[in-house]
Amino acid sequence: MLLNPRIKTNIDAINLRSFIVNLTDKKIFISAAGAGMGYSVAKMALDAGAEVYATDLKLEGLEELKSLGAKTETLDITNENLIQDYFSKSPNFNGIVNMAGWVHHGSILDVNKNDWRNSFLINLDSMFFVIKAAIPGLKKNGGGSIVNMASLASSVKGFPFRAAYSASKAAVIGLTKSVAVDFMSDGIRCNAICPGTIETPSLHERMDVMAKKLGSKKAAEEWFVSRQPMGRLGQPNEIASLITYLLSDAGSYATGQPFIVDGGTIA
């Protein structure tokens, strides 16, 4: 983990010994669960007693979750017909976690039509498809919790070379608030997570690109860490713990909020 050795941290202790929530008897759907933050959410939800339905575009990563007790299936969340079919055959869920995302690097001058459309298809449309398919089941269950992955790079803060990504993630926050207001009387809560820089496979892919410019992977890692006020990158479990809380009854008074978890970036 890319941490600052001078700063004491207890990240490894983020498990049920230090963060106790109860998801027993709750059925939780999670997209992009095969790696990174999605995997951490699935693992933590399983540890909290949930019945986890983990999906991803690829089988890789899902196999370990299956061995831990999750019900797994490959699913293209950009295909509305496949989403409708999946939810028509699934039980009524208590929680929905939309984790899928794609980062385009570039200013608006670097964004072509396909980049723009793909950014919105993966980052926003997929959530629209999933939420629309899931709400009837949530209503039948008397309510539930939806958590959408947004980003600090959104309406929260501007970042260089994130034009398409930031626009799509700002729209996620808007969708989240609309769903929260429209279905509050049905007992459905909807929140968004706006992480800062989290150490995931996706981030390491971006580090590899940066390494070509800076000369080495180590230099790229140091560059990413140097931008963090806490002197380290965030870890997937630090996001998963908040999402697990929001899925649980402990988070029952929270809705319509973009939760910022950024290591002090905009403090």
Question: What is the predicted function of each stretch?
Answer:
Residues M184, R189, A254-G256:
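Short, small/polar-rich loop/turn modules that mediate ligand/substrate recognition or access, typified
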Residues S107-I108, D115-F120, F224:
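Substrate-binding pocket helix/loop in short-chain dehydrogenase/reductase
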Residues I131, S168, T176:
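Active-site helix of classical SDR
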Residues G34-G36:
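Conserved glycine-rich cofactor-binding loop
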Residues A100-H104:
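Conserved NAD(P)H cofactor-binding loop of Rossmann-fold oxidoreductase domains
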Residues R232-V261, I266:
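C-terminal substrate-recognition "lid" of short-chain dehydrogenase/reductases
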Residues S151:
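Residue(s) in the substrate-gating loop at a strand-loop-helix junction
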